[in-house]
Swiss-Prot record:
Entry keyword annotation includes Nucleus: yes
Lumenal side: 269-307
Official protein name in the record: Leucine-rich repeat-containing protein 59
LRR repeats by residue range: 10-31, 40-61, 63-84, 86-107, 109-131
Main function: Required for nuclear import of FGF1.
Amino acid sequence: MARANGRSQNLRDKLDGNELDLSLSDLSEVPVRDLVAIPKATALDLSCNKLTTLPDDFCNLSHIVRLDLSKNQIVQLPSEFGRLMNLQHLDLLQNHLMSLPVSFAQLKSLKWLDLKDNPLKPDLAKVAGDCLDEKQCKECAQRVLQYMKSVQSDHEIELQRKLQLDKERKKKLEAKQRVKEEQEREMRKRKKQQQKERKRRDYNAMQEAERALNSNKKAEEEPTENHKRMATPKEKKLAQRQSRLRKIACILLFGLLVVLLVVVACRFTDLKAINMCTSVNAIYKETLSALHSNPVLERFLQDPSSQ
């Protein structure tokens, strides 16, 4: 801290009114902190040194009105150089400048400018002119400020264009991301549906297998309707014949039962006195007489009245 104060005091020793002369001091960098401590120095001469750049915090010296940077090796001014709002006189003679920062357009107080003997770009060199006298240096300041305002406008347009492109690119990326996420959702949904379908098919197959197993068990226990339908023509003909015989047997049995009932009625009830029963009893007796010759049947057909 004492060392910094010492350097500041050394600079104050070089202060003459509001002018601070640091020319021919073999400086390779600007002592910005020491200069900030001397706001009274509104005119700063840094000519004939070994400066190649100016630090960014040099732009904090907004109190400077007159600045001489001639005959150095400066290749580029700080990007925020336009913050030196009070700067009116700027000498950049014999440096290595090719261009000026866009913020240079903000030096609205600038009245005098010398850019001679710099490797300026053609457009800027044409605007700057020769600056051979006071009048030309004043005109140089006006033309360069106007030119830099145009550059600033183009820069802002380009910046807006880049921002718009970035915005559109971001939108496209977001849209692409949404499409990707939607595809992933559809894929997950389709995969889930496929799993569900596979489970359903497995379940149906299992149910079908169980039904087939139950059907086989039932087929082993008793003939199914399918087996019946698959009977051979010979079996069908035999079944039809048996059916007819059963029907005939039923008819005969029914007729025999009717005859038996009539005989019983005529033999053992009061109806035996009527003419029909008389005939029935006569036929019955004749039949018994014909069958008495058979000893086996005689026992069953014996006249109950004789017992």
